[in-house]
Amino acid sequence: SGWRAEEFKALDTRDFKHRGPVTDECLEIFKAVCGGGAVEYRGEHYQFEAMQCYPPSVQRPHPPILIGGISNRALRRVAEHGTGWMSVSLDPERIPERLDRLGQLCAKNGRTLDDLWLVHKLFISIGEEQPDVGGGRKLGTGSVETVTDDIKRFQDYGYRSIIFRYPGFDADEQTRQFDLLADKIMPRV
């Protein structure tokens, strides 16, 4: 549903204050129209007469839905609508608690954590340790060994994918970082 009011304003989308309920309705609509056949919808934010999306999705019951966020509301949305959860900037000490909460919410929806594809977005800076806001080391930064250990921690928690990103805009440094990732770290995980 987003987290920056400036993005909502720039895109001239529905108001930022109601982004959660708007996103919930969009997810309901998306899942319904992907199923094929005519769909009508009557929600608080969206209403439409019978319409059909053609061709229907070949993925059943709908294409995968990866939902990001670490708040309780985001986790509820994952449990109700998602086929996967993407955590971003999640302190490793909070992973067990967030996974436990997500598991509880999944159970309320007749699901388990095993039903979800767990993904983490990790910003990398191999060879340069960077501080996090709490004064510790930011995950994904530091030596080859340290970053390798960070990735293994996510694997140990059941994550099946990690999306790597270099936070800078220097193309040469970005290429160097991903070469290091491919050559020095990926063979170890």
Language-model segments: which ranges?
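Active-site-adjacent structural elements that line small-molecule/cofactor binding pockets in enzymes
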Residues: S1-V189
